[in-house]
């Protein structure tokens, strides 16, 4: 290794960047290219243009680390902290530190610590100067919360965020386990009253039906706002923001204003409007642009009626807006974007830099977004409250990132590394790697900002949810960063501060009474699952990943801390998996080479035969069968009787659906996030086989709870 390469790898280590990763496709350790490391390091703030800059940048980084004086964040688990990390010149290592701690409640505590009585944990010489590392003790018994410590060191004040958090995330009380539920994307729900896309009213209908069958949970995809005009990106995993809701799902006739708003009612009753609704309703795929445009026409009339009547409802609206100040900012951003019709990075400088004024947008558009968010909030709140009253909870999903042209990346841009994309290295399914196209969060700037954006993100979801899935939970530890312009597999892992992120997650979880499920699928480092267990996060168990070709042990059993399911939204339904349709489709989409397809088909044939034998021998099938609907029914009963605390089934598996909702890596070659369910909600109670199977699942779950 050359001296310059060694200096580059040293610099990477100082920024917590891994210089290599395991390539499971070629079964070897793969080194990140120098150009990749330079791009990632620049995104982290390192002053490097070429490899020859690494040595000087490393020396500067080392000085920065040791001259920081105080870490910007410290964690107190269950009220007790190991202290605040201090890095000081040895000449200041024995000085007195005046401390003022302001608790979240407003209470203040003051004390002075003599560092002469604190043992140094490390010593180092940097550019000829000696430094020491010590821990500044904190008082014990701190209440939960986000507290602010001001530590005056050598005459200079330093602000430190103290996160006092429970070690464990919230879990439901004993007796609330052995629950079951179903999954369907909200956009896919069909009914006799929908406007071309499922809405919160349809979700309410589904929740009530599941509750009548003894179910406890309805899971769906993220319910966050998306770009549905220009720009256009309907993926629920690329939202405009993780701090607001998707107005597409508002059930317009349920809005109180609708009853008294003649213009809105006249619009909805007009022949032209009804023809458009019927056209959207009949289509097998969701037409997001048309559906959103249609719904917006009605919402705009409702907001005008609200302001014209000037009654208690207007007062309630104004109270809501006043209580949510960032909503005003969001509405201005969306309204300005509609006028500009281009990404915020291409806006005039003042707007791009976050200074929006009244003339920069249409006032009607601003009011529309305020009103649409209020209605989305009201309907989700009613949905969650009503569902809990009926014993059914919504299982929310929090995506890993946001659209790079969206509100969060604009207003909270310092929290993001906008020069790179998050993704994943090559794996057996995606042999070229994946570029997810959104900007990852910046680990150091998050700390400097006191994790404000992360706190608001978790809190927004947990205020409504009682079950929250964290997409790609490995992202609390590290993420694969890909410099812009590089191929998907040409990235490097960047590490975060997991203790601090878990502290925020468990604190918000306990405060809101929301259990957390971590999506730990794919490439999972050895330290992730033990950390999840330590903090009482539920893991995921997916049948298609737990199958093997031994008929005596064809299915690995789920554990008592795993949410179990047959598949995910990124996988083909069970019937397609069973017939190998997923393999053929990936070949057509050029996501799988012929040799890999032959190998997968052979493996799949051995697995499906073994699973059929296993389910028959174990008593879940009355006779050996390879029919997908039989396998689904048997596997569903098998999982329902397991010790998994929660089991969630893709409802479409119950009728043998073969088309997936999403094919990762397919881009526009597949209608991702658009396919509607085969049956309307009104038809489901008449699907005798489905109703009987869900009834069996419910009985198996209750029996497992009694036995367990």
Predicted regions and their residues:
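Basic helix-extension-helix modules of the SAP/HeH family
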Residues: 1-47
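Glycine-rich, histidine-containing beta strand-loop boundary motifs that form or position
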Residues: 23, 153, 184-186, 219-224, ...
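Acidic/aromatic-lined carbohydrate-recognition and catalytic surfaces
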Residues: 42-111, 121-151, 164-412
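Alpha-amylase-like alpha-glycosidases and glucanotransferases acting on alpha-linked glucans and related
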Residues: 106, 230-381, 401-646, 652-653, ...
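Short acidic/polar inter-strand loop motif in beta-rich domains
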Residues: 154-159
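Structured C-terminal cap/extension of enzyme domains
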Residues: 656-706
């Amino acid at each position: 290794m050359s001296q310059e390469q060694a200096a580059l790898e040293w610099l990477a280590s100082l920024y917590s960047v891994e210089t290599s990763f395991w390539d499971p496709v070629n079964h070897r350790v793969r080194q990140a290219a120098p150009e990749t490391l330079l791009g990632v390091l620049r995104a982290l703030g390192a002053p490097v243009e070429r490899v020859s800059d690494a040595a000087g940048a490393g020396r500067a980084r080392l000085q920065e680390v040791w001259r920081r004086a105080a870490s910007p964040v410290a964690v107190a688990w269950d009220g007790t902290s190991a202290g605040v990390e201090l890095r000081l010149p040895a000449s200041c290592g024995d000085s007195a530190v005046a401390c003022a701690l302001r608790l979240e409640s407003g209470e203040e505590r003051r004390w002075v610590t003599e560092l002469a009585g604190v043992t140094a944990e490390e010593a180092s010489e940097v550019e000829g100067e000696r430094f020491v590392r010590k821990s500044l003790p904190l008082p014990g018994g701190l209440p939960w919360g986000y507290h602010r410590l001001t530590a005056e060191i050598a005459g200079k004040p330093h602000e430190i965020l103290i996160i006092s958090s429970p070690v464990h995330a919230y879990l439901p009380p004993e007796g609330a386990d052995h629950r079951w539920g179903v999954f369907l994307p909200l956009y896919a729900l069909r009914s006799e009253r929908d406007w071309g896309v499922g809405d919160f009213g349809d979700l309410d209908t589904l929740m009530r039906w599941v509750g009548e069958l003894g179910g406890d949970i309805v899971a769906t995809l993220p319910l966050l706002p998306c770009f549905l005009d220009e720009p256009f990106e309907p993926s629920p995993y690329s939202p405009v923001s993780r701090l607001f809701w998707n107005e597409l799902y508002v059930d317009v006739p349920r809005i109180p204003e609708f009853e008294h708003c003649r213009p809105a009612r006249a619009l909805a009753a007009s022949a032209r409007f009804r023809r458009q609704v019927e056209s959207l309703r009949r289509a097998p795929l969701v037409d997001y642009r048309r559906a959103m445009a249609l719904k917006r026409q009605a919402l705009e009339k409702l907001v005008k009626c609200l302001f014209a009547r000037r009654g208690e409802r207007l007062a309630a609206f104004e109270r809501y807006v006043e209580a949510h100040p960032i909503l005003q900012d969001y509405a201005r951003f969306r309204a300005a974007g509609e006028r500009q019709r281009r990404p915020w990075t291409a806006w005039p400088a003042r707007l791009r830099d976050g200074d929006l004024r009244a003339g920069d947008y249409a006032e009607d558009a601003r009011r529309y977004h305020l009103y649409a968010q209020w209605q989305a909030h009201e309907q989700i709140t009613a949905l969650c409250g009503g569902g809990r009253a009926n014993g059914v909870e919504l299982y929310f999903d929090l995506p890993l990132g946001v659209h790079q042209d969206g509100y969060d990346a604009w207003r909270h841009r310092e929290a993001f590394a906008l020069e790179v994309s998050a993704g994943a290295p090559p794996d057996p399914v995606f042999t070229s790697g994946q570029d997810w196209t959104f900007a990852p969060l910046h680990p150091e700037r998050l700390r400097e900002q006191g994790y404000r954006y992360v706190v608001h993100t978790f809190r927004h979801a947990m205020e409504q949810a009682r079950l929250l899935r964290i997409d790609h939970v490995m992202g609390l530890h590290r993420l694969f960063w890909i410099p812009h312009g590089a191929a998907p597999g040409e990235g490097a892992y960047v590490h975060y501060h997991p203790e601090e992120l878990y502290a925020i997650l468990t604190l918000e979880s306990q405060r809101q009474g929301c259990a957390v499920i971590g999506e730990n699928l794919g490439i999972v480092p050895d330290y992730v699952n033990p950390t999840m267990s330590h903090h009482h996060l539920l893991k995921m168990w997916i049948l298609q990943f737990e199958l093997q070709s031994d008929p005596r042990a064809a299915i690995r059993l789920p554990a008592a801390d795993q949410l179990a399911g047959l598949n995910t939204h990124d996988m083909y339904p069970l019937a397609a998996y069973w017939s190998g349709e997923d393999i053929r489709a990936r070949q057509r989409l050029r996501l799988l080479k012929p040799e890999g397809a032959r190998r997968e088909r052979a493996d799949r044939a051995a697995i499906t035969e073994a699973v059929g034998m296993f389910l028959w021998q174990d008593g879940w099938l009355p006779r050996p069968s390879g029919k997908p609907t039989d396998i689904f029914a048997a596997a569903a009963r098998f999982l329902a009787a397991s010790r998994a605390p929660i089991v969630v089934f893709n409802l479409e598996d119950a009728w043998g659906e073969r088309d997936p909702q999403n094919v990762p890596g397919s881009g526009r070659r597949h209608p991702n996030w658009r396919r509607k369910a085969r049956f309307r909600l009104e038809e489901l109670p008449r699907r005798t086989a489905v109703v009987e199977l869900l009834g069996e699942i419910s009985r198996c779950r209750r029996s497992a709870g009694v036995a367990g």
